[in-house]
Regions:
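Nucleotide-sugar donor-binding/catalytic module of glycosyltransferases
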Residues: 1-144
Length: 144
């Protein structure tokens, strides 16, 4: 079974972070490790993240504020520590069987793979606005 690491880059995410973390905590197949990478938030993000330590989540605070894309790219440093890295934005929710469905086809892939999934857009009330349901792996072929 592949090791799964989820990294959640966040900056001032207090309005959505708890719902995102709860969607990870309630997975049918939990990640082996979940890191909340806080980009020096100035709102209630820290207290929400620390409350999830008892559920096994880790909170890491950046040394300094990074532009959003740089914070996201900094999360990529964890790729070498795991078989599967999932970068989850702090305002996204995942279906309860997301990781189970994500990992199943990856078990058949040798070497590296890139996986993407379709998405559903919901409004602030949780009403579906648009989207679909898909998880699909594409192997990255070695050069030569």
């Amino acid at each position: 079974m592949s090791r799964l690491l989820t990294v959640i880059p966040v900056y001032n995410g207090e309005h959505f972070l708890e719902a995102t973390l709860e969607s990870v905590a309630s997975q049918t197949h939990r990640p082996d490790r979940v890191i909340i990478q806080d980009n020096c938030s100035t709102d209630g993000t820290r207290s929400i993240a620390l409350a999830y330590k008892k559920k096994g989540f880790e909170w890491l605070l950046n040394d300094e504020y990074l532009p959003s894309l740089d914070n996201f790219n900094a999360a990529m440093r964890f790729a070498e520590e795991t078989d599967v890295l999932h970068l989850l934005t702090a305002d996204d929710l995942i279906h309860p069987d997301f990781y189970a469905r994500l990992l199943e086809p990856l078990e058949k892939v040798e070497g590296r793979a890139l996986v993407y999934s379709a998405y559903e857009v919901i409004d602030e009330d949780g009403t579906l606005v648009e989207g679909g349901d898909l998880v699909s792996p594409f192997p990255i072929l070695p050069e030569g």
